[in-house]
């Protein structure tokens, strides 16, 4: 697991936290396996590649109908690309070149399955389109060739590779300075598709020095569609974790993104927030650069945006920033983030609720004042309700938030969580299949029991007030059951809790694990009945 905080913070936490079972690196969590899962999903709010599909007007309809007849007939074995089309493409007549390039472009714009492979497998056709990109005296030909190449690059990685190998990228970057906005916009679109293909393609485009001309375009353009496409391309240049882009090559975009966050256009805002979420996903140095660009207050404001596609990436960016150290987390808190996060916990979208819980869990991994701020914002009652009733993926994040608070909180703060009823939902998590969450719940209960032991000693009664609450929630039965868990850390923790907090005079020797000296591991009696009660 990645290191979440600076060494100084690590040392401080290890000394100050009463519970060392969850180390600081674990408590402050970047997206791990769920981040990977999210990246693999086709997100409705953001496409990494886009095809330019023409809106057909009546004048072009007859020609397009004939073209489609030709395309449909190709499914019977005839080629959609005739020898005549290829000859016209290589003609010296610029009118024929334009007409034929337009034909190719229309074919490549057809839904749902454009004949990309047939086009790229026709010798020298892609190279010819790249040649046409250089024809500064004929901007219409440049535009049509750029459009055709854009749609080829919207395909598979292999199809995108053909466009790169034909030498299109440096020329597209030059065209960002074209005098013709249509050509500029189509070049941006093509570069966005290429950068969105893979980290290798993204880095190649960055190494071709795209950033300065792209930022210049963004600064000067007054055309909304151009700005939208440019911000989308920029977000693709910032995207990716394995590996991430070289930060020095993308960080110069931060001042421009800071300005774009004040746009009134939802599409533009969404891509600007996604770009910031990618830039803030990493070590604290990256987080600091994002903070220094002055975006935090506006990102927090955008948490309340009425369009889900804006609020979601804004929340991701805010969540990434609070994976930083306590000072970085405090910047977000100082922007009045907690009332916004409380509001998002009631979102109709489960993914937003889950992400809000994850963000809060990283705040409760902070210092005691930050835990108190979460208490003062009345967030914990909602978290405990989520812990009881939500989908499992959201309950997991709420469990982290509560256990983190029991790890770093004061006795008074822990008592407050107990008074809200956190014990029963933590006990309920002891029967889930996810071993990590079972450990998180056990650690939360251990922190509560440790406080109860201190209170029993102080009162002179010697009675731990929280043992009874755990027994009432059937927690003791579940902890006993975990002594036969396959995970060594879980069964050892369960055994230790039973022995330390629920021990009886006549110890039942059958509960104690035996030690296999040869394997250096514990051996447990197999339960007679199969383990039940597991939930997904």
From Swiss-Prot:
GO annotations of cellular component type: cytosol; host cell; membrane; NLS-dependent protein nuclear import complex; nucleoplasm; nucleus
Domain spans labelled IBB: 1-60
GO molecular function: nuclear import signal receptor activity; nuclear localization sequence binding
Gene3D superfamilies: Importin-alpha, importin-beta-binding domain, Leucine-rich Repeat Variant
Region (NLS binding site (minor)), start-end ranges: 316-404
Residues carrying N-acetylmethionine: 1
Source domain of life: Eukaryota
Residues where Phosphoserine is found: 6, 113
InterPro entries: ARM-like, ARM-type_fold, Arm_3, Armadillo, Importin-a_IBB, Importin-a_IBB_sf, Importin_alpha
Annotated Pfam families: Arm, Arm_3, IBB
Nuclear localization signal, short sequence motif: residues: 45-54
Stretches for region NLS binding site (major): 147-239
SUPFAM superfamilies: ARM repeat
Residue segments, region Disordered: 1-29
Positions in coiled-coil regions: none
Tissue: Widely expressed.
GO biological process, alphabetically ordered: entry of viral genome into host nucleus through nuclear pore complex via importin; maternal process involved in female pregnancy; NLS-bearing protein import into nucleus; positive regulation of cytokine production involved in inflammatory response; positive regulation of transcription by RNA polymerase II; positive regulation of viral life cycle; protein import into nucleus; transcription by RNA polymerase II
Keyword terms, alphabetized: Acetylation, Host-virus interaction, Phosphoprotein, Protein transport, Repeat, Transport
Sequence ranges of the ARM repeats: 76-115, 116-159, 160-204, 205-243, 244-288, 289-328, 329-370, 371-410, 411-453, 457-502
Family: Belongs to the importin alpha family.
Task of the protein: Functions in nuclear protein import as an adapter protein for nuclear receptor KPNB1. Binds specifically and directly to substrates containing either a simple or bipartite NLS motif. Docking of the importin/substrate complex to the nuclear pore complex (NPC) is mediated by KPNB1 through binding to nucleoporin FxFG repeats and the complex is subsequently translocated through the pore by an energy requiring, Ran-dependent mechanism.
Complexes and interactors: Interacts with ZIC3. Forms a complex with importin subunit beta-1.
Name of the molecule in the record: Importin subunit alpha-7
Originating organism: Homo sapiens (Human)
Lineage, uppermost ranks: Eukaryota, Metazoa, Chordata, Craniata, Vertebrata
């Amino acid at each position: 697991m990645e290191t979440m905080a600076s060494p100084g913070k690590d040392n401080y936490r290890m000394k100050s936290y009463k519970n060392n079972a969850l180390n600081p690196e674990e408590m402050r969590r970047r997206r791990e396996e769920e981040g990977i899962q999210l990246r693999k999903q086709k997100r409705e709010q953001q496409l990494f590649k886009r095809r330019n599909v023409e809106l057909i007007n009546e004048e072009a309809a007859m020609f397009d109908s004939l073209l489609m007849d030709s395309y449909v007939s190709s499914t019977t074995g005839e080629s959609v690309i005739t020898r005549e089309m290829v000859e016209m493409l290589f003609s010296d007549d610029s009118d024929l070149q334009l007409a034929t390039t337009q034909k190719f472009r229309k074919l490549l714009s057809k839904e749902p399955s454009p004949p990309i492979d047939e086009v790229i497998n026709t010798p020298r056709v892609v190279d010819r389109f790249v040649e046409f990109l250089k024809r500064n005296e004929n901007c219409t030909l440049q535009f049509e060739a750029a459009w055709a190449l854009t749609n080829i690059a919207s395909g598979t990685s292999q199809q995108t590779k053909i466009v790169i190998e034909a030498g299109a990228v440096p020329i597209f970057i030059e065209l960002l300075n074209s005098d013709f906005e249509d050509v500029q916009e189509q070049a941006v679109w093509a570069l966005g598709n290429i950068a969105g293909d893979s980290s290798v393609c993204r880095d190649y485009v960055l190494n071709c020095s795209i950033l300065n001309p792209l930022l210049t375009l963004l600064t000067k353009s007054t055309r909304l569609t151009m700005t939208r496409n440019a911000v989308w391309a920029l977000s693709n240049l910032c995207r990716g974790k394995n590996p991430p882009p070289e930060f020095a090559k993308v960080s110069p975009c931060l001042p421009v993104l800071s300005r774009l966050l004040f746009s009134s256009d939802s599409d533009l805002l969404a891509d600007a927030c996604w770009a910031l979420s990618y830039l803030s996903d990493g070590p604290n140095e990256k987080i600091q650069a994002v903070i220094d660009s002055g975006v935090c207050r506006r990102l927090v404001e955008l948490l309340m945006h009425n369009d889900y596609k804006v609020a979601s990436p804004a929340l991701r960016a805010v969540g990434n920033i609070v994976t930083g150290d306590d000072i970085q987390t405090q910047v977000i808190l100082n922007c009045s983030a907690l009332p916004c996060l409380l509001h998002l916990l009631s979102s109709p979208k489960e993914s937003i609720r889950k992400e809000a819980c994850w963000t809060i869990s990283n705040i409760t991994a902070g210092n005691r004042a930050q835990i108190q701020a979460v208490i003062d914002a009345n967030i914990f009652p909602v978290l405990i309700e989520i812990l009881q009733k939500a989908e499992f993926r959201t309950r997991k994040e709420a469990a982290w938030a509560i256990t983190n608070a029991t790890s770093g909180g004061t006795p008074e703060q822990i008592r407050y969580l107990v008074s809200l009823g956190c014990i029963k939902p933590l006990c309920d998590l002891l029967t889930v299949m996810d071993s990590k969450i079972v450990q998180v719940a056990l650690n939360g209960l251990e922190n509560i029991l440790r406080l109860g032991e201190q209170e029993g000693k102080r009162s002179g009664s010697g009675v731990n007030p929280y043992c009874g609450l755990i027994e009432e929630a059937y927690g003791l039965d579940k902890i006993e059951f975990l002594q036969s868990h396959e995970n060594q850390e879980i069964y050892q923790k369960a055994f230790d809790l039973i022995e330390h907090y629920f021990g009886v005079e006549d110890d039942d020797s059958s509960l104690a694990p035996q030690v296999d000296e040869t394997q250096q591991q514990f051996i447990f009696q197999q339960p007679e009945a199969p383990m039940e009660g597991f939930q997904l």
